[in-house]
Amino acid sequence: MILELIERLFSRSGKNSGEDARRRLKLVIANDRSGLSPEMMEEMRREIVEVVSRYVEIDPGEMEFSLESDQRMTALIANLPVRRVRRTKAKSEAQES
């Protein structure tokens, strides 16, 4: 997750550099306002994926997590593409023990 974020932040794309800089600045501000360390963000991402995976099969290669912030609040945006809905709830590793 962190490596994907860094690649997205610093990758060269067809967009102009002003748009890239604005997007990076928004992400930095949102991270700062949230008070979440990169380690906490990664742990939260892992737990969200674990819980959602009990009910649906998700495409891990296409997942996106981001923080968006305005003057009033910070929002965690999770985009988890669903491959299929599970017929029964999958057991988590904690439940299997």
UniProtKB/Swiss-Prot annotation:
GO-annotated biological processes: division septum site selection; regulation of division septum assembly
Record Gene3D superfamilies: Cell division topological specificity factor MinE
Any Pfam family hit: MinE
Ligase keyword on record: no
One Gene Ontology cellular component annotation held by this UniProt entry: plasma membrane
UniProtKB keywords: Cell cycle, Cell division
SUPFAM superfamilies: Cell division protein MinE topological specificity domain
InterPro entries: MinE, MinE_sf
Entries under HAMAP family matching the protein: MinE
Family listed: Belongs to the MinE family.
Function per UniProt: Prevents the cell division inhibition by proteins MinC and MinD at internal division sites while permitting inhibition at polar sites. This ensures cell division at the proper site by restricting the formation of a division septum at the midpoint of the long axis of the cell.
Protein name, per record: Putative cell division topological specificity factor
Organism: Synechocystis sp. (strain ATCC 27184 / PCC 6803 / Kazusa)
Lineage, uppermost ranks: Bacteria, Bacillati, Cyanobacteriota, Cyanophyceae, Synechococcales
